[in-house]
Amino acid sequence: MAISIKTSEDIEKMRVAGRLAAEVLEMIEPYIKPGVTTGELDRICNDYIVNEQHAISACLGYHGYPKSVCISINEVVCHGIPDDAKHLKDGDIVNIDVTVIKDEFHGDTSKMFIVGKPTILGERLCRVTQESLYLGIKMVKPGIRLRTIGAAIQKYAEGEGFSVVREYCGHGIGRGFHEEPQVLHYDADDGGVVLQPGMTFTIEPMLNAGDYRIRTMKDGWTVKTKDRSLSAQYEHTIVVTENGCEILTLRKDDTIPAIITHDE
């Protein structure tokens, strides 16, 4: 497994790409309201990426994906395709997943939005999913096994009564959208990967309110929970530092510091 170690110049470019991706999620928030279509949200994001940020949407055309962002509602786990016929409604939980390319480097991030008045379950699932991401990020430092992080996320999520999707995971990122290693959010063989300074990857747990099993729709992209239960996901791109990590896609609404250090 060839895991690339980024140079300081690479990391600086990834800070820029990561900041741009985060800014898309900050920009779109006021538009998330009952009645808006996911197609309209996609166009707003694309216009902002192309015309304001002078960047590229990594999703558009990736393996034939037809839109600029992924918008996944309620029981949709990931890769929901924006559609002018799909209107948001009160109580929906919505994930928007954005990946921006700037100067050849990628920034990848997603967050949950709650439309109008939240349901108790929807709000709790979103909160626990974000907390599981933060838990994983706070563990990142040189010398730790990736498997340790996945096991901790799984234990926390299941302790809260939720399940962790198995088929999708975090990934290395840089010049490539998806690089080595795979970052699993549950306890499984990680190929012995030990973190080193300069590694860049995403952590992006997907938690279901019901069973962890999923199914892919006929469009070949949209993934839903098999039991139709709600699903939530949060994602950040991070870099391993000499004594911890730095979040490259931090937003103003995040409640975790950008730089996390361990003083052992």
Swiss-Prot record:
Binding residues annotated for substrate, in chain numbering: 79, 178
BP-aspect Gene Ontology terms: proteolysis
Positions annotated to bind a divalent metal cation 1: 97, 108, 235
Reactions performed catalytically: Release of N-terminal amino acids, preferentially methionine, from peptides and arylamides
PANTHER family: METHIONINE AMINOPEPTIDASE
Primary role: Removes the N-terminal methionine from nascent proteins. The N-terminal methionine is often cleaved when the second residue in the primary sequence is small and uncharged (Met-Ala-, Cys, Gly, Pro, Ser, Thr, or Val). Requires deformylation of the N(alpha)-formylated initiator methionine before it can be hydrolyzed.
Protein's UniProt name: Methionine aminopeptidase
Lineage: Bacteria, Pseudomonadati, Pseudomonadota, Gammaproteobacteria, Enterobacterales
Underlying gene: map
